[in-house]
Amino acid sequence: LAVHSLKDLPTESHPGLLLAAVPPRQDPRDVVVARDGLTLGELPAGAGVGTGSPRRVSQLSALGLGVEPVQIRGNVDTRVGLVGAPAADGGVDAVLLAYAGLLRLSRAEVVTEVLDPLQMLPAPGQGALACECRIEDDATAQLLAVLDDPDTRDAVTAERTLLATLEAGCSAPVGALAEVVMGDEGDELWLRAVVGDISGAPSIRRSATGSRD
């Protein structure tokens, strides 16, 4: 048995492994952790906003707020610790993080703004977990099956199918979010996606609704 952050799984599955369960998804949105309790729009022009994600850099640039993306590395605590730190120590005015990671670490109190997907679409699969086992291990697969959430599985499958169709990896500047919604003929999937460019070129945003099948 292996449990992963689903957004980090390769789009092409390993032939010997089974994705036995995708549990209910944590909040998939991105958040801002900023000094002085500021929101993204309240940061002054030229403020440094830390992120290690090309997807976030491209969408942040597209918002036209005049802030400066700053490349950062490290775990969640390291990144949060950079907020308000001296510039000589790599400090920034704010960082962009996945809400799910902070919730799982019980660090939601540091969040100063939860970003609407209209501003910042998350990575495909963000907020979801993947439970894998060996494809021939029926006993483990049956035990894991009770954890599976069909709505979450269908949503992340749509997001990852988009990523595979674009032949993009998990580090590409691609955001996607699918949700199960009620349509005229029952449940449907609503998929929103963005393909960005870290050079500042215009992003491409599209949305579509279709059958869960």
What are these regions (language model features)?
Residues L1-V3, D93-A94:
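Short, Asp-centered acidic motifs that coordinate Mg2+ and/or phosphate
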Residues H4-K7, V22-P23, R35-D36, G52-P54, ...:
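Fold-independent oxyanion-binding glycine-rich loops
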Residues L6-V67:
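A conserved helix-loop-strand patch within extracytoplasmic ligand-binding domains
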Residues A62, G66-D213:
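Small-molecule-sensing regulatory modules
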